[in-house]
Amino acid sequence: QICTNCCAGRKGCSYFSEDGTFICKGESNPENPKACPRNCDGRIAYGICPLS
């Protein structure tokens, strides 16, 4: 289980719950991170990111 939330997640990554339900896409660009809360979204179990 990863600790992140939709705001702080990497842009381009998709985040899913334990049972594979799509939760959201990440919104934070690593080059220019958004000001995001550092809380964990308990629904997010893993993220899938493109290999770019």
From Swiss-Prot:
Q: Where is this site: Reactive bond for trypsin?
A: R38, N39
**What highest taxon heads this organism's lineage?**
Eukaryota
**Molecular function in Gene Ontology:** serine-type endopeptidase inhibitor activity
The UniProt entry, under InterPro entries, shows: Prot_inh_I20, Protease_inhibitor_I20
Question: What name is this protein filed under?
Answer: Proteinase inhibitor
Which family, according to the similarity comment?
A: Belongs to the protease inhibitor I20 (potato type II proteinase inhibitor) family.
Which keywords does the record carry? Disulfide bond, Protease inhibitor, Pyrrolidone carboxylic acid, Secreted, Serine protease inhibitor
Q: Where in the cell is it found?
A: Secreted
Instruction: Point out residues bearing the modification Pyrrolidone carboxylic acid.
Output: Q1
Task: List cellular component terms (GO).
Answer: extracellular region
Q: Which organism is it from?
A: Solanum melongena (Eggplant)
Q: Give disulfide pairs as residue numbers.
A: C3-C40, C6-C24, C7-C36, C13-C49
